[in-house]
Amino acid sequence: RVEALRRRAELRQSPVRGFMGGRVDLLPHQMYIASEVASRLVPRVLLADEVGLGKTIEASLILHRLHLTGRAERVLVLVPDALVHQWFVELYRRFHLTFSIYDEERCDVLETEEEGVNPFLESQLVICSTSFLASSAKRAEQALAAGWDLLVVDEAHHLEWSSSSASAAYPLFETLTAKIPGLLQL
């Protein structure tokens, strides 16, 4: 038993903890980027590889490592509508991370079950579409109040801002990033 506890402690302190066990074939640059970013106490980065070089895998590796080491217990992933289920499947299939998909219907059900509850406090790992939160001030406020450790934003290049105009989702992004310590933009 003592040997098992010693071995467990060694594994928990391993420099590759969170990078092993994922069902992925990594490219060398992905491991390097994931290791560099995950070693930061509170990562705030823009992952800007070329199309097809695995930004999603890099972000998932970082997320997995931060979650396993307890530095990102509450994670909010914002993605375009068309990618919600793809992210859900990839995170579960490749990293065995079980996220909850949030949309208006799910929020309504959670609020019906317990009046006055913030639905975003019901799950630790949440995926929702950027447009869902950007189109509802109530849901955006609830998400903001939920106290996340890490925000992951896919297709961040769609969040445009200039002195004369901004994309519809940019104010949401700006507000969330001001309050959430960790940030991964893809």
Q: Where are the predicted features?
A:
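Phosphate-binding P-loop
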Residues: 35-44
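Active-site alpha-helix of zinc metalloproteases
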Residues: 44-45, 150
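A generic secondary-structure signal marking the coil-to-beta-strand transition
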Residues: 43, 123-126, 182
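Short hydrophobic/aromatic beta-strand immediately N-terminal to the Walker A/P-loop
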Residues: 45-48, 76
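The conserved Walker
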Residues: 51
